[in-house]
């Protein structure tokens, strides 16, 4: 526990261990993907129903199922990230095959009563994918990662470093001779340090590879009252797994007299968690061609375990030194995500054109890490950095037998109070519905901007990132 607190306090690497509010945002944010039909229409299903992915949006839609159904959705994803650092543009990408959805719906007719059906469903939906690769490279003649370590180490005695009673990066830097004590003549100035790099320009290179996903097991129940009012509830049990591996290199480019030639610093962070939430929803059929809907999502309460491992290697002209530090005991904490509210409407034109729209609101400042005494800084940062935001989704569907054409758009608002890191989704799809079975395909283009700090923001400006995700989604379903 003490070592982790020291690592957090140092805040040298903002990717893995420095900002607990980053973890809170990651597990509170969801992608706008699901079955092929859901994805093709921008996820605007709050008043439509009859779609398994919508059980994680507005569970009232379960009341619209008139037949039992099985659905299965694989997807193929290509993610690319472009970085812009000190005049150098770099790109990286990864590909992945996912299972986005698997579910069963059972209809239970109630006969000649006002409650026409009571339906139940079980399955799971993928809510977010964490697969991403980032590559950052450029030359820096200013303050470097090593300078950051030197300044953070100043104030610790040599005895502190030798016994490991300092920030873990400082201890590793000492043990690998990345830093040395400052001398005043022949006397050591204890508590003051210098870098063994020269003062010249350094080439900096970093790769960040993350993988994992946020999935939700859903248990839903709902019904239809007089085919006018549809009510539903979903018990969600989300599970998350996240791994991030970051490798940073800093090396001399101009000074050939320096004995220290290169620093390699790597970090590996893993997180596993599970939680629970409740979603309640209603849809009302105003007329044969117009429906409205509303839903509310309680906060998800997560229990999360993390492991962190780091390694530092220094390369000299005639030797290489390696120092690693890991954490064998997992660090466990709790996270509560924000509430979410959704209002929706949909209408039909000319019997074959469907238009739908959703409006979502959630307040990222309401996320909270527990226990309080461990996360005072993180919770203050959540309140300061994040904001209340809105998501807008629009979808359309045209039935031109035997095909169904679809398109959608979603604007997912930025969680950050002072920076526009919103995302836009553009989607298209095609479906075939043969009564007893259906097959849908969708393409989704998702784009958004972000930033990454190579190390402490007092030493360096953020690197600009542009992330693009291409998703090809297939759904097959059977009714019985």
Task: Briefly describe each language-model feature range.
Residues 1-24, 480:
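Bacterial Sec-dependent N-terminal signal peptides
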Residues 36, 48-57, 63-140, 215:
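Outer-membrane beta-barrel translocator/receptor signature
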Residues 9-17, 60, 74, 430:
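Residue-level signal for alpha-helical transmembrane segments in multi-pass membrane proteins
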Residues 19-33, 38, 107-480:
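Outer-membrane beta-barrel porins/channels
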Residues 13-14, 68, 403:
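Alpha-helical transmembrane segments and their juxtamembrane interfaces
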């Amino acid at each position: 526990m003490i070592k982790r607190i020291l690592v957090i306090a140092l805040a040298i690497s903002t990717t893995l261990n420095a900002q607990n509010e980053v973890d809170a945002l990651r597990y509170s944010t969801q992608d706008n993907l699901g079955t092929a039909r859901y994805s093709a229409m921008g996820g605007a299903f709050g008043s439509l129903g009859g779609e398994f992915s919508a059980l994680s949006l507005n569970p009232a839609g379960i009341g619209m199922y008139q037949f039992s159904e099985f659905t299965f959705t694989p997807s193929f994803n290509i993610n690319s990230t472009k970085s812009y650092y000190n005049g150098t543009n770099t790109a990286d990408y990864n590909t992945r095959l996912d299972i986005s959805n698997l579910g069963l719906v059972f209809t239970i007719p109630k006969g000649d009563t006002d409650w026409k059906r009571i339906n139940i469903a079980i399955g799971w939906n993928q809510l977010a994918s964490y697969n991403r690769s980032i590559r950052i490279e450029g030359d820096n003649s200013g303050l470097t990662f090593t300078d950051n370590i030197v300044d953070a180490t100043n104030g610790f005695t040599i005895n502190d470093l030798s016994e490991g009673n300092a920030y873990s990066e400082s201890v590793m830097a000492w043990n690998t001779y990345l830093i040395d004590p400052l001398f005043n003549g022949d006397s050591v100035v204890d508590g003051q340090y210098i870098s063994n790099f020269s003062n010249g320009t350094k080439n900096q290179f970093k790769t960040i590879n993350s993988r994992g996903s946020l999935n939700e097991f859903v248990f839903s129940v709902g019904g239809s009252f007089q085919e006018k009012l549809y009510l539903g509830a979903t018990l969600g049990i989300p599970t998350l797994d996240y791994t991030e591996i970051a490798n940073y290199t800093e090396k001399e480019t101009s000074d050939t007299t320096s004995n220290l030639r290169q620093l390699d610093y790597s970090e590996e962070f893993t997180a596993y968690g599970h939680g629970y939430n409740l979603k309640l929803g209603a849809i009302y059929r105003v007329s044969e061609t117009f429906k409205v809907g509303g839903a509310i999502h309680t906060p998800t309460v997560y229990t999360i375990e993390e492991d962190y491992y780091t390694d530092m290697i220094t390369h000299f002209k005639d030797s290489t030194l390696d120092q690693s530090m890991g954490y064998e005991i997992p660090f466990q904490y709790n996270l509560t995500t924000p509430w979410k509210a959704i209002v929706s409407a949909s209408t039909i034109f000319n019997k074959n054109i469907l238009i739908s729209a959703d409006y979502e609101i959630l307040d990222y400042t309401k996320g909270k890490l527990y226990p309080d005494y461990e996360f005072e800084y993180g919770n203050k940062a959540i309140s300061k950095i994040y904001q209340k935001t809105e998501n807008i989704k629009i979808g359309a569907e045209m039935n031109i037998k035997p095909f169904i054409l679809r398109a959608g758009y979603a604007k997912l608002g930025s969680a950050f109070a002072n920076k526009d890191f919103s995302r836009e989704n553009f989607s298209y799809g095609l479906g075939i519905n043969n009564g007893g079975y259906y097959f849908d395909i969708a393409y989704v283009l998702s784009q958004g901007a972000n930033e990454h700090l190579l190390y402490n923001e007092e030493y360096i400006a953020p690197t600009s990132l542009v992330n693009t995700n291409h998703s090809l989604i297939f759904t097959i379903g059977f009714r019985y």
